[in-house]
């Protein structure tokens, strides 16, 4: 492809990028960093550019920055969870499927600079390519604006993923609640199924968690296990608030 084509692609990128940063309410100084973050190796190869001008180094940095940011968030949000649980949660957030979800939330793949062949073969929607670009963007944002800007971005795009219970099954709230009760010497914990309704293919279970002889909270779920997890999560929050 010609240099004129390259100029057109870069100009289009810059226009889209500026608009995207306005939408995200993020400041930026070094457009060149972000251009590199969205430059796939196929784009670099098509125009015979420096082989290190693609986004893989920024992807490397962004991965580390994401792990740090998410680690701090989980550390603060779940003060009673042991290291093993936090590690599992972080791995669920900082992984290809989740990063693709985050990128698609804000149509970040529309900014990726691709070579002609990669574009034709569907590279713009390829999960590995999209997740790599997301990490590279975070790396560029960190270099340009610092960790605080990455935190601000994460509050918009990443942390709600946790707040909206997208991590069900990773956090064992029954264990978390049991350990908390044990530390507080509150007594014995039991669970009781109090309702089961709906057709066989779409059952809804309601369970309650009982501390000593008192019902603390209820939870609903598609399985008995899920309803107990929900009840434990609510009970844990209730007790923590009482003891705060």
From Swiss-Prot:
It comes from the Bacteria. Mg(2+) binds at residues 59, 132, 135. Its EC number is 3.1.26.3. One of its GO terms (cellular component) is cytoplasm. It catalyses: Endonucleolytic cleavage to 5'-phosphomonoester. PROSITE patterns: DS_RBD, RNASE_3_1, RNASE_3_2. The active site is at residues 63, 135. Residues 172-241 form the DRBM domain. GO terms for biological process: mRNA processing; regulation of gene expression; rRNA processing; tRNA processing. Keywords: Cytoplasm, Endonuclease, Hydrolase, Magnesium, Metal-binding, mRNA processing, Nuclease, RNA-binding, rRNA processing, rRNA-binding, tRNA processing. Transmembrane segments: none annotated. InterPro entries: dsRBD_dom, RNase_III, RNase_III_dom, RNase_III_sf. Residues 17-146 form the RNase III domain. Belongs to the ribonuclease III family. Homodimer. Digests double-stranded RNA. Involved in the processing of primary rRNA transcript to yield the immediate precursors to the large and small rRNAs (23S and 16S). Processes some mRNAs, and tRNAs when they are encoded in the rRNA operon. Processes pre-crRNA and tracrRNA of type II CRISPR loci if present in the organism. This is Ribonuclease 3. The gene is rnc.
């Amino acid at each position: 492809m010609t240099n004129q084509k390259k100029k057109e692609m870069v100009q289009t990128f810059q226009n889209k990028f500026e608009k995207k940063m306005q939408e995200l309410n993020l400041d930026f100084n070094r457009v060149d960093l972000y251009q590199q973050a969205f430059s796939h190796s196929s784009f670099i190869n098509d125009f015979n550019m420096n082989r290190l001008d693609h986004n893989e180094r920024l992807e490397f940095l962004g991965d580390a920055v994401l792990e740090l940011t998410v680690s701090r968030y989980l550390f603060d949000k779940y003060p009673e969870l042991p290291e093993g649980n936090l590690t599992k949660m972080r791995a669920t957030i900082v992984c290809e499927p989740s990063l693709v979800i985050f990128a698609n939330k804000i149509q970040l793949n529309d900014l990726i600079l691709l070579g002609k062949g990669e574009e034709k073969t569907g590279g713009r929607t390829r999960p590995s390519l999209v997740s790599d670009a997301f990490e590279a963007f975070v790396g560029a944002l960190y270099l340009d604006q610092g960790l605080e800007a990455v935190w601000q971005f994460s509050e918009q795009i990443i942390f709600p993923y946790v707040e909206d219970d997208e991590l069900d099954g990773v956090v064992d709230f029954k264990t978390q609640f049991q350990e908390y009760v044990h530390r507080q010497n509150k007594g014995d914990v039991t669970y009781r199924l109090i309702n089961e309704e709906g057709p066989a293919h779409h059952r809804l279970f309601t369970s309650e968690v009982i501390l000593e002889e008192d019902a603390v909270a209820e939870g609903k779920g598609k399985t008995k296990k899920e309803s107990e997890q929900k009840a434990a999560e609510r009970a844990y929050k209730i007790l923590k608030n009482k003891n705060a």
